[in-house]
Amino acid sequence: MLRIEALTRLHDRKSFDCGEAALNDYLRKIALQQIKKGISKTFVLVDSIIPTKISGFFTLSSCDVVTCDLPFGYAGKYPARAPAAKLARLAVSIDQQRQGMGTLMMTEAMKRILLVSENIGIIGIFVDAKNQNARNFYEQFGFLALQEKPLELFLPIQSLVAAWEAADYSSTS
């Protein structure tokens, strides 16, 4: 059975390979340090049969954004700088790609961000897509490209709340 849990030293970070050296290195060398320092939180997708093997991971953090770069129609709605959530990284192991693991983790990340938004103010979620394929993946969840920055994407918190309620994910854990 698949589950998502916080990254710990017990997880086998060295064996993880998503095909992107920068993401592999982050998980292996930096993620636990950033958790310890309170910079970000990394969550891993594991199977209960082999709970130390990482099938995928995502990292969440907070950020401060310059709102003049927001997509048309959003830039003028906020002060010059505003707080937001950042999906800093999302990766799936090569042997698990194209099996819905990314969508599973994205849904979990959005759920966690919604919980945060109930307690602190954020205008939405930001993500830096690595390439056009990644951008296409995020756009299916409603992300919009920033003005003049086609690989930097934004999902307004109101859009996330509305989509979540319409899909009735509230009953999932």
Feature-to-residue mapping (PLM):
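Short glycine/proline-centered loop/turn elements that form peptide/ligand docking sites
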Residues: 106, 131-134, 150-157
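Conserved acyl-donor/pantetheine-binding loop and adjacent beta-alpha core of acyl/acetyltransferases
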Residues: 53, 57-89
